[in-house]
Regions:
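Flexible, processing/modification-adjacent segments and terminal tails
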Residues: 22-30, 97-163, 234-238
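Bacterial N-terminal signal peptides
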Residues: 8-17
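Hydrophobic lipid-interacting interfaces of membrane-associated proteins
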Residues: 48-54, 79-82, 102, 182, ...
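N-terminal leader/targeting segments and the immediate start of mature chains
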Residues: 17-70, 235-238
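Gly/Pro-enriched, hydrophobic low-complexity segments
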Residues: 143-237
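Mid-chain, structured segments of secreted extracytoplasmic proteins
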Residues: 70-106
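Extended lipid/amphipathic-ligand handling interfaces
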Residues: 62-67, 88, 92, 189-195
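Bacterial N-terminal signal peptides that target proteins for export
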Residues: 1-9
Length: 238
């Protein structure tokens, strides 16, 4: 009788473990399907941001962003004086970055990085504005999923960094993404969601850099998709 009970317990434990493993496999597959590509073919967003760091406190910025297929455009303007801070475009993965009084920078967008830790990986921020969180253009060395009651945690290891994505167990809505590289950690909190063409989209981004204590708070006031995005971007010559 005891042996039979033990057999039942082992069989039950094996069944639970198998179901759990299958559930985890399904969730990680769904996460990769959702987060490795943008749900939009075209998206335009604009809004205001406040930057703190480098002895600057709450410097206002006006930001415009546009993605159309594989092409991306972004501009940042001084929110007080209206002067251009930067504008960039990416065509077929080739970046052209223009900064006042500097020669244009041209580089492969996948490999481009900046010295300032908070802006180390510009492509990450462009992807996030596309609502994309896993970069299949880079080789993924590891992936690990931790299941939670309300929120799941997915860790993606690349050669130069480890991204941690926290998303809703029920809706797959992203709450937070952090980027660990060298001795630094960039933490990005997404909030105040709206819907574009019935697709959830965040209107608030809070970006913090652990090492250099820099912070960028970005609030999107206008976001459009599809033909509406194309029409709005055309007004900027994009």
């Amino acid at each position: 009788m005891i042996k039979r009970t033990l057999l039942y317990l082992f069989a039950f434990a094996f069944l639970i473990q198998t179901i759990f493993a299958q559930n985890e496999e399904n969730i990680i597959k769904e996460a990769f399907d959702r987060f490795s590509k943008s749900p939009f073919t075209s998206i335009y967003s604009s809004g205001g941001a406040f930057y703190s760091g480098d002895d600057v406190d709450q410097m206002p910025l006006l930001i415009n962003y546009y993605m159309n297929g594989t092409s991306k455009y972004i501009s940042a303007v001084d929110g007080l004086f209206g002067g251009a801070i930067m504008n960039a475009q990416v065509i077929k993965n080739q970046l052209t970055l223009n900064v006042p009084e500097e020669e244009p920078i041209k580089d492969n967008f996948n490999n481009f990085s900046l010295e300032a830790p908070i802006m180390r990986f510009p492509k990450v921020y462009a992807d996030i504005l596309d609502y994309k969180f896993i970069d299949l253009d880079k080789k993924i060395l590891s992936s690990n999923l931790t299941l939670g009651k309300n929120w799941h945690t997915l860790k993606i290891g690349y050669a130069d960094r480890v991204d941690t994505i926290i998303f809703s167990a029920s809706t797959y809505r992203i709450r937070n993404i952090s980027i660990a590289f060298m001795n630094n950690l960039i933490d990005i909190t997404l909030g105040s969601y709206t819907t574009i063409n019935n697709i959830p989209y965040p209107k608030e981004f809070i970006i913090k850099s652990k090492t250099d204590k820099r912070e960028l708070r970005y609030n999107i006031t206008n976001v459009l998709a599809g033909e509406n995005a194309k029409r709005e971007a055309k007004k900027l010559g994009w």
